[in-house]
Amino acid sequence: MSAARLPSRIARHHPRGRAISISGPRRIRRASWALLLALSACRPAAPAARSGGVVDDAGDTVAVAAPPRRIVSLIPATTELLFAIGAGSSVVGRTEWCDYPPAAAAVPNLGDGIAPNVEAVLASRPDLVLLYHSAQNAAIAARLRTLGIPALRLNTDRLADVGRIGRLLGRVTGHAAAADSVAAVFDSALASATVTPTGPRPKVLLLVWEQPPMTIGRGSFLDDLVRRAGGVNLFEDVASSAGTVSIEAVASRDPDLILTTTAGPVAFASRPEWQAVRAVRERRFLPVTGSEFNRPSPRAPAAIRELSAKLRRAG
């Protein structure tokens, strides 16, 4: 399964099934974001800079005017990082999912970041565009560069990307010192928030889609978050960052908890086929609802502490 095909895969399954925590077209796109991040987590990071330009995570060397004054950020994580390092005033366009910090709401909403509206981007007169590293965005980046607009495709899939991408953005925008400070504070907070359990770790199913069941494997943001909070990913042995599993496989592994991203009732819990899973029968769901749980950001240490507290309360 490729990140590039993810949105269409979700669209195909929507008539027969639904995301565990979401409903409706806008939230389907939100699920696409979360899964896109997970599926691309296995890509190696490219070096941050080379002589003559900035090297993005697609390996492209891009000449960027220093510092850009009109940035379109089509990745929620980079929008958050730009504000964190003091470059928020340069952001002139964002996605509908760029919901943090609150000041980002004042930035014009250009719509979807998975399938960007190029005309809306061009209308913003950007001198830098930040795109998620996906096959679909390769053509968009190429078109923008042909028009003389620098475009960087970036991975923001893992906790390790917070400091790395933050420092890259700091150098590009002229906020290197602030970016180094944000990264250092983040690294320290991450170490402090990480839990080393004295007893067995609870097994947590990271379920992001119901029909067919899709889970997060090793190397993803949520996998790292759960591990640092003191749990263990039920499918940590799955080499791919995300994939389809059977309900029978879930039942045989007998998760202690099922992580969901909704605070309300979990609709699939009443479906007959899911009654084979003990955690479903016992309604052992672990809701995590904030945006800090769907993107690597400087808020990740707080997310780890919250998740750790939920794991302890769940027993």
Regions flagged by a language model, labelled:
Residues 69-134, 234, 274:
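A short, structured surface patch at a secondary-structure boundary
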Residues 2-3, 8-40:
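Sec-dependent bacterial lipoprotein signal peptides
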Residues 75, 133-134, 208, 238, ...:
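Short secondary-structure boundary segments
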Residues 95, 218-242, 262, 286-287:
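His/Asp/Glu-enriched short active-site or ligand-binding loop at hydrolase and phosphoryl-transfer sites
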Residues 33, 42-79, 175-205, 254, ...:
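Bacterial Sec-exported substrate-binding components of ABC uptake systems
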Residues 55-59, 110-119, 135, 238-247:
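Short helix-initiation/N-cap motifs at beta->coil->alpha
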Residues 127-128, 132, 138-214, 232-237, ...:
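Extracytoplasmic substrate-binding proteins
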Residues 118-125, 147, 244-254:
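Short helices/loops that flank or line small-molecule/ion binding pockets
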